[in-house]
Amino acid sequence: MTFVSDLFAIALGGSIGAVLRYLITLTVVSAPLSGWLTLHGSVGTTLANLLGCCALGGLFQFSQALVASDWVATGWAASLAHPRTLLAVRIGVLGSLTTFSTLIGETAVFASQGRILASSMLLGINVIAGWCLFWAAAAVVRNWTS
């Protein structure tokens, strides 16, 4: 029963993450400046990826603090500390919110259109800013849990 419950938690989290990603993209596309943003669909993907990296960094440090056992989660943090909840958030929500394959597809479209600079910038922003946000969030949570 545990395996099936884990799968259900991941599926539930995945549906939440997928809807969040769709809403982020819709918000960017319908923004007043969307005509100005020539990469508006890619901006939605980038925003979803960067938010996911930030959340994953915080979750990573949160998990590290739990393993270190010198910090005890209470309240909402105790609920998040449950292994099934971590699966639902990490693999479900964040896995479907962030989409590496969509990013690669969008960069390939720009490259095929001869927009090499746009393609390179899109990839670079996602990777470098995502990496920085991951560790920035981890540092914030580290300070909170110590």
UniProtKB/Swiss-Prot annotation:
Entry keyword Ion transport: yes
Domain of life of the native organism: Bacteria
Cellular compartments annotated: Cell inner membrane
GO molecular-function terms, A-Z: fluoride channel activity; fluoride transmembrane transporter activity; metal ion binding
Major site of localization recorded for this protein: membrane
Topology versus the membrane: Multi-pass membrane protein
GO terms (BP aspect): cellular detoxification of fluoride; fluoride transmembrane transport
Residues binding Na(+), per UniProt: G95, T98
Catalyzed reaction equations: fluoride(in) = fluoride(out)
GO CC term (a single one): plasma membrane
Record-linked PANTHER family: FLUORIDE EXPORT PROTEIN 1-RELATED, FLUORIDE-SPECIFIC ION CHANNEL FLUC
Family in the record: Belongs to the fluoride channel Fluc/FEX (TC 1.A.43) family.
Protein name as catalogued: Fluoride-specific ion channel FluC
Provenance organism: Rhodopirellula baltica (strain DSM 10527 / NCIMB 13988 / SH1)
